[in-house]
Amino acid sequence: MSIQNLVVNGGFENGALPPWVGQNATVTTQFSHSGFWSARLLGGAVTSFIAQFVPVDAGEGLEFLVSLAKEGFPAPSPQVQIQVSYFDSSFNFLGQGLFLNIPFNRLPIVENNTWLEVYQTTTPAPAGSTMAFILINTLPQAGTANVIVDDVALLDVEGGGTGPTGPTGPTGPTGPTGATGPTGATGPTGATGPTGATGPTGATGPTGATGPTGATG
């Protein structure tokens, strides 16, 4: 099984945003979830975002990961939205793979080295999909803190083919004999068999008594 991260520069270790595009977004070494760099989305009464197109195949279900935190205290974090959308090769919208809303003031404080680690599974890419559009944005609200973003990943997990069938295991021991079942009904009488051979002649019996003398002529 192989795991491929479709996002390029997801940890911002290039020291710049590209190939991400963004608005009110910069990179910084002041904070990081891993490595040295992260992205900062400006808080307050402005909309800030980073976005990137990545290649996908139709039918793929992907795993999305990102680490988020807010910068500074006591300012609350703004509402944050995360979207993964599917497009064809002509940039026609085909469907939503993921929409996640993180409510107002739900992000931990980055200065405490605490992060909200997001892990979500997308719906499979519909037929005709060639690209996924990843968008991470804040919603404008005065007085809210900057948002720190790091370790963005969209993982394609590819499983290997089915291996050959293993050898048959040994035969298990014979189980105990079950209880004797009930006697079945008496079957029908069979046909009369053929007559047997004539037996041997018996022994001669004893001579009978002498009969009476007849009358004188």
What are these regions (language model features)?
Residues 93-128:
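Extracellular carbohydrate recognition and processing domains
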Residues 2-42:
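Extracellular glycan-recognition surfaces and repeat-rich motifs
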Residues 12, 46-88, 118-122, 132-134, ...:
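Extra-cytoplasmic beta-strand recognition segments
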Residues 157-217:
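Collagen/collagen-like triple-helix recognition
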Residues 1-3, 11, 27-31, 72, ...:
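Cysteine-dense, low-complexity repeat segments
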Residues 37-48, 110-111:
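Extracellular beta-rich ligand/substrate-recognition surface
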Residues 1-15, 114, 122-130, 135-172:
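Extracellular polysaccharide-targeting segments
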Residues 20-22, 49, 74-78, 92-94, ...:
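Short acidic, gly/pro-rich beta-turn/loop elements at beta-sheet edges
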